[in-house]
């Protein structure tokens, strides 16, 4: 049975899963979820994701939700496909695990808030909360200071090869690099170079194209 991704083309979490699948050279069916009409909050969608969020993922009889859990499943189960997104060396895996936690716990909260305020709200006709932007930008700046130091030690955040750590960052960075917060990234040379590198990955570009068809 085909892999299916239920989600929204605008959703950073949906983008994350699509990019992972394409990095692994896996075919999948994208099933758009009409969030404007509240489809994600109703049955039958709630049978796929009981929290009423996107994406939801199906691989045969297996059903998953939460984008980072989905990408880890893909990277491990399909380890021999496409690009290797996990570090198999037990001595290197801990570093990757640490920075995956950093992305989810430190980077994601301010980055997601900024993506919502500066990337999504203008598209759907809502007013940006300038105070929220200022607060989140200050939080993000502190995180990126640490990233700048880490990227002096390795080419990517989890080590010297591109992994899920970096992939998980891409969707929010994609939105923010088209906003005034771009300067927060550009003012840190190593962070800026890292962003340019990961945003240029063919799998990311192909993933966007697939979701926006």
From Swiss-Prot:
Q: What InterPro entries does the entry give?
A: Glutathione-S-Trfase_C-like, Glutathione-S-Trfase_C_sf, Glutathione_S-Trfase, Glutathione_S-Trfase_N, GST_C, GST_Phi_C, Thioredoxin-like_sf
Which SUPFAM superfamilies would you find in this protein's record?
Answer: GST C-terminal domain-like, Thioredoxin-like
Induction / repression? By auxin.
Q: Which GO terms describe its biological process?
A: glutathione metabolic process; toxin catabolic process
UniProt entry tagged with the keyword Transferase: yes
Q: Which reaction does it catalyse?
A: RX + glutathione = an S-substituted glutathione + a halide anion + H(+)
GST N-terminal domain location: 1-82
Ordered alphabetically, the record's keywords are: Transferase
* Alphabetized GO MF terms: glutathione binding; glutathione transferase activity
Instruction: One GO cellular component term, please give it.
Output: cytoplasm
Q: What's its EC?
A: 2.5.1.18
* Membrane spanning stretches: none
In what residue span(s) does the GST C-terminal domain sit?
Answer: 89-213
Instruction: Show the PANTHER family listed in the entry.
Output: GLUTATHIONE S-TRANSFERASE F6-RELATED, GLUTATHIONE S-TRANSFERASE RHO
The family classification in the record reads: Belongs to the GST superfamily. Phi family.
Q: What is this protein called?
A: Glutathione S-transferase PARB
Q: Which organism is it from?
A: Nicotiana tabacum (Common tobacco)
């Amino acid at each position: 049975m085909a892999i299916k991704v239920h989600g929204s083309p605008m959703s950073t979490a949906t983008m994350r899963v699509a990019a992972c699948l394409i990095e692994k050279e896996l075919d999948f069916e994208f099933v758009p979820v009409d969030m404007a009409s509240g489809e994600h909050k109703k049955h039958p969608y709630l049978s796929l994701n009981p929290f009423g969020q996107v994406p939801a993922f199906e691989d045969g009889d297996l059903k998953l939700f939460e984008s980072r859990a989905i990408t880890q499943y893909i990277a491990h189960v399909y380890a021999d496909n496409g690009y290797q997104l996990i570090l198999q060396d037990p001595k290197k895996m801990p570093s990757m695990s640490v920075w995956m936690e950093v992305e989810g716990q430190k980077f994601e909260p301010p980055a997601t808030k900024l993506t919502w305020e500066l990337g999504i709200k203008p598209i759907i006709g809502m007013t940006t909360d300038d105070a929220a932007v200022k607060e989140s930008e200050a939080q993000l700046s502190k995180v990126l200071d640490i990233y700048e130091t880490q990227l002096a030690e390795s080419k990517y955040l989890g080590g010297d090869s591109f992994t899920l750590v970096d992939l998980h960052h891409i969707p929010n960075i994609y939105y923010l690099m088209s906003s005034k917060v771009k300067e927060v990234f550009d003012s840190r040379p190593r962070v800026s170079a890292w962003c340019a590198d990961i945003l240029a990955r063919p799998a990311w570009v192909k993933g966007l194209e697939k979701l926006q068809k």
